[in-house]
Structures are given as structure tokens and as C-alpha cells.
Amino acid sequence: MARIAGVDIPNDKRVVVSLTYVYGIGLPTSKKILAAAGVSEDIRVKDLTSDQEDAIRREVDAIKVEGDLRREVNLNIKRLMEIGSYRGIRHRRGLPVRGQNTKNNARTRKGKAVAIAGKKK
């Protein structure tokens, strides 16, 4: 297994798909990285030469991925909560942030439904 940005990427998959195992790299970013590194998308990870691996590593190092990206996202959310914006308040209360309806659904964000005592008669 090749190791890129601290993540073991699978050997048997195509490079373009394997790079998506790194947090912050999706398919479009993966294609851009390979184009900049001059590596074919169809080649398998196990068939990469060490020069190609180094070129891919250099391109990935130029992008914010894994721990740095997670830290930045968390700091952005924390900043929204501190300034008291609408989005920050929604984050603090554990409700949907992007305007979704909460009358019936939003169970993923709100958690398991809690029964109200004394509802039955």
C-alpha cells in the first residue's frame, strides 16, 4: 500500500479512485492532481513508479488535506458559534444548518426522538 498524506491508499484500485481515500480529495481534485503530476488516471497504485509516487505526494502536499483541513473546518464552525450568527446558533443547538425543515424530519441532526411524558390519555 502506498502512503500519501498519512493515509494508506489501496494497491489494487486505480490511482484516481485510491486518492479519494484521503480526506479532502474527491474525484475532481484527484483528476487535477494526476494531471499536474503527469500520471495516467488508468494506472493502478501497485504499478506506480517511485518517481510518480513522489510527484503525486508533492501535488497533494500543496493542498490542504486530512488533519489541517479538519482543523480548519472545526475552527470555522467554532468561529460561527462565537460570533452568534444564525448558522452558529444552529450548530450549537444541534439542528440543521442549511435551512432544512425540522417540523417532521431532521432526525440525523436532532438525534433519536424523545417521547413526551403524559401525552397518552
From Swiss-Prot:
Q: Region Disordered: which residues?
A: 96-121
* InterPro entries reported for this sequence: Rbsml_uS13_C, Ribosomal_uS13, Ribosomal_uS13-like_H2TH, Ribosomal_uS13_bac-type, Ribosomal_uS13_CS
An annotated GO cellular component of this protein is: small ribosomal subunit
Which GO annotations describe the biological process of this protein?
Answer: translation
Enumerate the UniProt keywords alphabetically: Ribonucleoprotein, Ribosomal protein, RNA-binding, rRNA-binding, tRNA-binding
Pfam families according to UniProt = Ribosomal_S13 (PF00416)
Annotated Basic residues bias: 106-121
Q: Does the keyword Ribonucleoprotein apply?
A: yes
Q: Which GO terms describe its molecular function?
A: rRNA binding; structural constituent of ribosome; tRNA binding
Briefly state the protein's biological role. Answer: Located at the top of the head of the 30S subunit, it contacts several helices of the 16S rRNA. In the 70S ribosome it contacts the 23S rRNA (bridge B1a) and protein L5 of the 50S subunit (bridge B1b), connecting the 2 subunits; these bridges are implicated in subunit movement. Contacts the tRNAs in the A and P-sites.
Give the UniProt family note: Belongs to the universal ribosomal protein uS13 family.
What does the subunit section of this Swiss-Prot or TrEMBL entry state?
Answer: Part of the 30S ribosomal subunit. Forms a loose heterodimer with protein S19. Forms two bridges to the 50S subunit in the 70S ribosome.
PANTHER family, alphabetized? 30S RIBOSOMAL PROTEIN S13/40S RIBOSOMAL PROTEIN S18, SMALL RIBOSOMAL SUBUNIT PROTEIN US13M
Q: Which HAMAP family match?
A: Ribosomal_uS13 (MF_01315)
Protein name in the entry: Small ribosomal subunit protein uS13
Organism per entry = Streptococcus mutans serotype c (strain ATCC 700610 / UA159)
